[in-house]
Amino acid sequence: MNLRDKLDVYMRLARMDRPIGTLLLLWPCLMALTFAAGGLPDLKVFIIFVIGVFSMRACGCIINDYADRKLDAHVERTKGRPLASGEVSSKEALLLFVVMALFSFGLVLMLNPLVVQLSVIGIILTIIYPFTKRYTNMPQMFLGTVWSWSIPMAYAAQTGTVPVEAWWLFAANWCWTVAYDTMYAMVDRDDDLKVGIKSTAILFGRYDRQIIGLFQLAALSCFIIAGMVADRGAIYAVGILAFIGFGLYQQKLINGRERAPCFTAFLNNNWAGMVLFTALMLDYLVLG
């Protein structure tokens, strides 16, 4: 394998070719920076967090594939991943993980000590998450914590503290993550049952749509409260209405519990996050 092919394999291992996860991680992070700054965030902090989202998502994907390398070969959607297919060795994957983790840690060293302390917790959570699928039926809930950890970090970077209002946004994103990652798990449910991988899609069973709906409603409520605490106005309210519309569309897609529509519903959450963040930013810029 030549250098170009090897780099292509590493890019796929880090999911650089599939940015959906990065975007789902990015929107709440940018919302946190915007709420914390009361508008446009500090440029240095903004750049560090955008780069950090990409690098930490890569870390998460690599350690996830390392943990699942023997199981992924038996799952239709994941059998072509570089570790499962043998295109890259376990040692190479671990080395790439360490490099990306050190790069990410180097980024936060340019910020204040509180952010550095929170980042250590973040990397530990990232390492633990892939293994939760073996021991609990609720790995999506653990992922919600991992996926939301950038929110207190963003507040800490922008303000030097993590105020109470940060946790409303944390709760909103936690519930939202559980909802959309359960949609994602519905795609793999049949394969996961065969190989022993646990998920909320399996745990919720025939009540999956209803429970996803409850998490969507809880996320919506917390996003509304976060906006009220920050005294947001009509433009943010329009974003909230759009978020409701996206949620209803996703419920329609997962109604039949078929793989392709469930995956489409998962992907649709990127648009929901982008629209809500855009509405928040415009609300600050236009209404002050």
UniProtKB/Swiss-Prot annotation:
<protein>
    <recommendedName>
        <fullName>4-hydroxybenzoate octaprenyltransferase</fullName>
        <ecNumber>2.5.1.39</ecNumber>
    </recommendedName>
</protein>
<feature type="transmembrane region" description="Helical">
    <location>
        <begin position="20"/>
        <end position="40"/>
    </location>
</feature>
<dbReference type="Pfam" id="PF01040">
    <property type="entry name" value="UbiA"/>
</dbReference>
<feature type="transmembrane region" description="Helical">
    <location>
        <begin position="262"/>
        <end position="282"/>
    </location>
</feature>
<comment type="pathway">
    <text>Cofactor biosynthesis; ubiquinone biosynthesis.</text>
</comment>
<comment type="similarity">
    <text>Belongs to the UbiA prenyltransferase family.</text>
</comment>
<dbReference type="GO" id="GO:0006744">
    <property type="term" value="P:ubiquinone biosynthetic process"/>
</dbReference>
<dbReference type="InterPro" id="IPR006370">
    <property type="entry name" value="HB_polyprenyltransferase-like"/>
</dbReference>
<dbReference type="GO" id="GO:0005886">
    <property type="term" value="C:plasma membrane"/>
</dbReference>
<dbReference type="InterPro" id="IPR000537">
    <property type="entry name" value="UbiA_prenyltransferase"/>
</dbReference>
<feature type="transmembrane region" description="Helical">
    <location>
        <begin position="234"/>
        <end position="254"/>
    </location>
</feature>
<dbReference type="InterPro" id="IPR039653">
    <property type="entry name" value="Prenyltransferase"/>
</dbReference>
<keyword id="KW-0472">Membrane</keyword>
<keyword id="KW-0812">Transmembrane</keyword>
<comment type="function">
    <text>Catalyzes the prenylation of para-hydroxybenzoate (PHB) with an all-trans polyprenyl group. Mediates the second step in the final reaction sequence of ubiquinone-8 (UQ-8) biosynthesis, which is the condensation of the polyisoprenoid side chain with PHB, generating the first membrane-bound Q intermediate 3-octaprenyl-4-hydroxybenzoate.</text>
</comment>
<feature type="transmembrane region" description="Helical">
    <location>
        <begin position="96"/>
        <end position="116"/>
    </location>
</feature>
<dbReference type="InterPro" id="IPR044878">
    <property type="entry name" value="UbiA_sf"/>
</dbReference>
<keyword id="KW-0831">Ubiquinone biosynthesis</keyword>
<keyword id="KW-0997">Cell inner membrane</keyword>
<feature type="transmembrane region" description="Helical">
    <location>
        <begin position="210"/>
        <end position="230"/>
    </location>
</feature>
<keyword id="KW-0808">Transferase</keyword>
<keyword id="KW-0460">Magnesium</keyword>
<keyword id="KW-1003">Cell membrane</keyword>
<dbReference type="GO" id="GO:0008412">
    <property type="term" value="F:4-hydroxybenzoate polyprenyltransferase activity"/>
</dbReference>
<keyword id="KW-1133">Transmembrane helix</keyword>
<dbReference type="InterPro" id="IPR030470">
    <property type="entry name" value="UbiA_prenylTrfase_CS"/>
</dbReference>
<feature type="transmembrane region" description="Helical">
    <location>
        <begin position="43"/>
        <end position="63"/>
    </location>
</feature>
